[in-house]
Amino acid sequence: MFKAKQFKVRKPEEVLEDLAWARKQYRRVERIFLCDGDALCLANHKLLTILEYIEKNFPECERVTTYGRASDVLRKSREELEELRRHGLEMVYMGAESGSQKVLDMVNKGETREQLIESVNRLENAGIKASVTFISGLAGPELWEEHAIETGTMISEMNASYVSLLTLMLEPPAPLL
């Protein structure tokens, strides 16, 4: 899905222009999702510029959410995460995919089981809810049992506010990657 789309960080000014347009178009905005990538990869001062604009211009907004990668969460200090929460970041959606390190390696996740657990716990400890997604069927027939057991233990080690499960069903001979 994302192979054809090149990731690039948008300038905060561009995001503020989009928000200004949305303010003119919509009378009441209760939820804002900072979409199309991982907003947590931004330096905190840039993300705070966006959150402060939302606070000022969308006083009725009850919730701001975004996608996040474990590595980007781990680059932020507890103080930085708490500051994001104070300025309205309510929840981060994170794809863990599996609790099995073998499966994470097999699908080239680029993050370890330990990083995923630590990042979710850091978010929750800073007052930001984590919504974590796992993928049933991702391990294939060889690793299904390890995938299931390790995912269960990982969920137990996380302090996530929400956990969801997606199901992957491939038709043979579809490659996993």
Model-found features: residue ranges?
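Conserved C-terminal portion of the radical SAM core fold
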Residues: 34, 91, 114-175
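Aromatic/hydrophobic pocket-lining residues that form the small-molecule binding cavity
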Residues: 12-15, 47, 77, 116, ...
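Canonical Radical SAM [4Fe-4S] cluster-binding loop centered on the CxxxCxxC motif
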Residues: 1-17
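Short, solvent-exposed loop/turn segments at secondary-structure boundaries
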Residues: 7-10, 43-45, 105-108, 142-146
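Short acidic, glycine/proline-rich loop/turn micro-motifs
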Residues: 2, 103-106, 175-176
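Conserved SAM/AdoMet-binding glycine-rich loop
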Residues: 23-125, 129
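A short, flexible beta-alpha/helix-coil linker loop
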Residues: 2-5, 39, 99-101, 136-139
